[in-house]
């Protein structure tokens, strides 16, 4: 396990073994800067929301689940599959076969759009991630891609929904979450805290249904 995640993994293991009842479900969050909670800070420096999405999800879920952040700012689906440098979990296929997490929240597409990943490649890669997770018994929650003022993410959002339909996975339609552009943006492409929190709340509503006893 990479250094960044060892504490989360230890916490997950400890919590899963507590209480003598059913194990607390572990939920892993995969994604780019939208999951990490990145925003542009002073002089263009990258900083982070006061309460990043995965931390907010943990607050909302309480002791009903353990949330583990597996995101990497700027990461694409292909980066996750290949396990590029600094990826918290290495190659996805190897990690998903070994992790104790039962639910995978997969939220890619923002960085793919900005970096110009061909749509067909994005769809194949996302479908591969879902297939790998489902093949080892994981439940998958796919999260759509937020709108921007330029529309660059629109086709990627449609692909996420299409992959969810094709694989029968749960899907969070982030575009149904109330937003006022550009006021709810922290910078050109990242949600400010209030919008991020509303999106996370929508994700958590799905997770509550997926993880309830």
Residue ranges and their predicted role:
Residues 1-16:
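Sec-dependent bacterial lipoprotein signal peptides
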Residues 18-71, 94-98:
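Serine-esterase "nucleophile elbow" of acetyl-processing enzymes
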